[in-house]
Design a protein with these regions (language model features):
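N-proximal helix/coil linker or "cap" segments that precede and/or mark the start of modular domains
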Residues: 21-34
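Thiol-/selenol-based redox modules, centered on thioredoxin-like
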Residues: 140-178
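Bacterial N-terminal signal peptides that target proteins for export
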Residues: 1-10
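Short, internal strand/loop/helix patches
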Residues: 90, 107-140
Length: 178
């Protein structure tokens, strides 16, 4: 379990380098416009999403029970990090859908990782992001999103990425770098 969580954390570290507003009952898709919302810092204090509206965001929203999804993609990102002053990347741990891992233990691990790597890692103990953005079912999912500065979802994937999705991810990254 710890190995899986650490692998997810590496994903978050690697990452650092329009539609209508979503109602809670809708499912977000590419083109959906989302609003600033809150998640929690590693000490469980509510915080707004960093740089929302100021930079394009690359968000890894991961269920730690299934953090090994997309391991080949994660390895590829480790080799070819996304580097741009226009894109801010961070991870969010979906605590609500990880009943086998006590939230306090996960937060402690996140705090250690943040201190060691200076990675931006947040937690979502109650589906705050999922509900605010209408992400639908995120249980057992590795969710990867690219959100433009104006709040438009430019890329959204849940679960294992296909080759076509990986190609699309990099295409959108290049678009957002400009």
């Amino acid at each position: 379990m710890r190995t899986i969580f650490i692998r997810w954390m590496l994903t978050a570290v690697v990452a650092i380098a329009g539609g209508s507003v979503v109602a809670q009952t809708q499912t977000a898709t590419v083109g959906t416009k989302v609003k600033q919302t809150k998640v929690c810092d590693p000490s469980n204090n509510p915080v707004e999403l960093p740089y929302f509206g100021k930079k394009n965001l690359m968000i890894f929203y991961v269920d730690p029970d299934h953090a090994s999804q997309n391991s080949a993609f994660v390895a590829e990102l480790e080799e070819n990090q996304v580097k741009s002053d226009k894109i801010y990347g961070f991870g969010i741990v979906n605590l609500k859908d990880a009943p086998l891992l006590p939230n306090s233990i996960v937060r402690m691990m996140v705090r250690r990782k943040v201190k060691k790597t200076r990675a931006a890692i947040y937690t979502d103990p109650d589906h705050m992001l999922r509900d605010a953005w209408g992400l639908g079912d995120v249980n057992d999912q590795f969710v990867l999103m690219l959100v433009a500065k104006d709040g438009t979802i430019e890329f959204l994937s849940k679960g294992e990425l296909s080759k076509a999705q990986i190609d699309e991810f990099y295409r959108v990254v290049e678009k957002l770098k400009k």
